Curated annotation (Swiss-Prot):
Keywords linked to the UniProt accession: Chaperone, Cytoplasm, Nickel insertion
Assigned GO CC terms: cytoplasm
Main location group: cytoplasm
Function description: Required for maturation of urease via the functional incorporation of the urease nickel metallocenter.
Protein's recorded name: Putative urease accessory protein UreD homolog
Subcellular locations according to the entry: Cytoplasm
Pfam families: UreD
InterPro entries for this protein: UreD
Subunit structure: UreD, UreF and UreG form a complex that acts as a GTP-hydrolysis-dependent molecular chaperone, activating the urease apoprotein by helping to assemble the nickel containing metallocenter of UreC. The UreE protein probably delivers the nickel.
Amino acid sequence: MLSTALPQNKKGWQAMLDLRFQRLHGKTTLTTRHHVGLLTVQRPFYPEEETCHLCLLHPPGGIVGGDELIINAIIDSDCHTLITMPGASKFYRSSGAQAHLQQNLTLCNNATLEWLPQDSIFFPGAHATLHTVFHLSSSSTLLAWDLLCLGRPVIGETFSHGTLANRLEIWVDGSPLLIERLHVANGELTCVARKPWVGTMLFYLGNETQLEDIREKLTPLENYAGATLTDGLLTVRFLSDDNLRCQ
């Protein structure tokens, strides 16, 4: 795996994690694990026998302005991997410097990835840029979600100031299938209907039956949720005041 070079002479934590999964002896195995800085992983475990479950560990003190984190993962052919995190990613207040999180996930032929991290919480005054890219083969399978919490609504705290730029991309066989951007600045939450919870769930390769079933389940969220199916990509988007409803 080619590692991404970290920028030098910057304030904040610079961290990188390179992962590769290969099928060995009848199961998916983490064969490459290279890290720089505070990004690391727990020991893989196998509650589903052949499927490799892995927990990513972000810096324990949270993410602040000037931090730059890069995660690269390759899931080789015929592998099945579930990647999650033990807790939410917290982006704290910054005096102006941006915190950056770049995530690059590549799925080879017939590979399956369940990308199920906990939510990302953005404290008032945080300045964060997130960029997540999935590179798929047409024969691979992806289940992923992207959960954002603006402020801390459980204690009545809103994202009254700060900035968030979130970019989500899915490419299939080198062609773009989804490129989505969210930009929030200066406490202006009109673009998300002033809801603190913003969620996106993705499934490839989806079908019409799944789309109809999901739309029925989204009915209680009324106008704050929707599902689409485009070229096999099933996308669910939702806004909420309650994280339990999102989950």
